[in-house]
From Swiss-Prot:
Residues 2-170, 421-585 form the Miro domain. This is Mitochondrial Rho GTPase 1. Residues 622-629 are mitochondrial intermembrane. Pfam families: EF_assoc_1, EF_assoc_2, Ras. Mitochondrial GTPase involved in mitochondrial trafficking. Probably involved in control of anterograde transport of mitochondria and their subcellular distribution. Belongs to the mitochondrial Rho GTPase family. It comes from Neurospora crassa (strain ATCC 24698 / 74-OR23-1A / CBS 708.71 / DSM 1257 / FGSC 987). InterPro entries: EF-hand-dom_pair, EF_Hand_1_Ca_BS, EF_hand_assoc_1, EF_hand_assoc_2, EF_hand_dom, Miro, Miro-EF-hand_domain, MIRO_dom.
Amino acid sequence: MSTAVRICVCGDEGTGKSSLIASLVKGVFVANKIQAVLPQVTIPPTTGTPENVTTTIVDTSARPQDRTTLRKEIRKSNVILLVYSDHYSYERVALFWMPYFRSLGVNVPVVLCANKSDLVSDGNAAQVAEEEMLPVMAEFREIDSCIRTSAKEQKNVIEVFYLCQKAVTHPIAPLFDYKEGQLKPACVDALRRIFFLSDKDQDGYLNDQEMQDFQQKSFDKPLSQEDLDNIKLTVSKSVPSSSTDKGLDLRGFLQLNKLYAEKGRHETIWIILRKYHYTDSLSLEDSFLHPRFDVPDYASAELSPAGYRFFMDLFLTFDKDNDGGLNDRELAALFAPTPGLPHSWAETSFPSTTVRNEAGHITLQGWLAQWSMTTFLEPKTTLEYLAYLGFETPNARETTTAALKITKPRKRRRRPGRVDRNVVLCYILGSSGAGKSSLLDVFLNRPFDTLYHPTIKPRQAVNSVELQGGKQCYLILEELGELEPAILENQAKLDACDLICYAYDSSEPDSFSHIVELRKRYPQLDELPAVYTALKADRDKTTQRSELQPDAYTAALNMSAPLHVSVTWNSISELFVALAEAATNPSTAFPRSEEPPADRASLYMALGATACAALAAFMIWRRSTSNAA
């Protein structure tokens, strides 16, 4: 919204432009002759101006020799006050002034002012408005409003400049189409989203309590029962087919705002829109969608308890049939106030990335897991959708970042102990056909598919895992597909990864050699904790064509032997627990052959302390010897 308003006062000579400005500044009519063009006037923000903006008023001359200055001032302004005072100057509004503004290519609102109304009897006021102003407004849509004034009688002097201010701070053009007599599509979309967010129980109606909450949020004051009844009465008269017994439905809500626009109360609509973070172009504020949220190196983003509670409540609200899953219709309703599914979700074939029920609908467990993964991989996407979906905090100063938290950096992975993470990422590396995709399927409780489907694009799967002691964490398994070389050469990708799972087919003789070659080709993998896994253990085990067999290879690294598992075994869940445990306690899973280097800092501190103690003992001995002598 504009924080400064520049008003260019235009009109024929003798219409009273300068007198209007002087009367506003002095507060009284200036009877003495004043200069033809007044100097620029700046009015500082006061409680009487809309949104407390700074207003600059520029007087102009209509003389041909001043046309260059006039053009310059019109182009610099963001609202034009066009003044006429008699029949001749009125005719010039349509014949000269409005076409002239258009020829300059300016796109600013115009406030039409019929000045010197003291020369017209009050009985003719309505006739003047109907016969003069309305036809011009109908012909030139850029005319925002019209008003009759008198500088001599101080009639509507303050009001005319207030209209100019409001034409900039609360423009009607983005909201209402006078030609069609309807709210504009962008305005309807914004109001529809606001209705959606206000309808907390999603029953299609704003009940009395929801109306009260909406009123308090929008206008910071309660709604009296009388005002509420009047709103319902107004809507029922305007839309006879809209019942208000259950509350205000979407149709009635839109009609109410349409009435505000028709009656010149579009300021009310703007107050509502801006409380819900809409800009003058009716898009959501970028700072609202994308608040500052920096994740330090080696740290990660996760949902906070408030974030998990919000997404859980959202799921329960839209699971209308209470079957424990969100079907396509329920998902569409949930994402109605957003641009649709997040781009990354669509790219990864959501909801195939998480837990679904037998009908293929995402469950609450899968829903929370999906948002946990999104927050870990793309925290800015989560923040954007929290804004779209209406996340709110009790503290008005807090942003959507209150729904997220940042974990402690885990730069030193070799340090013993658990990392401060509830969401961890594990890359599954192995040869084609080793069973990586089947591993992801069974992780999401999918049935085993005997057909081989090669993985082209990276594929992710996320689910919750219960660690030893009962703590829950979210484990993200990612198969890299054909992008494996690019990802393994990307240090930022490796820094984000918590664990490598080297998987090979224990029934295929050439499968393990792929892992050996992979570790030689990418030595940086040695900096990541790792778990070795022998898949397809339900088949006959075969000797691997490798210099060392898997057990001997891992023993040479002082690591645990490969875990032998099969996706057809019920015990497969133990593998996921082992992966989550290794990811959250990385010092137990490092692929290295030498013992960890001594902690030299501790050694130096110990030596320093010993030296200090020895020096102190020597000084005490020397002093006692001196005293004895």
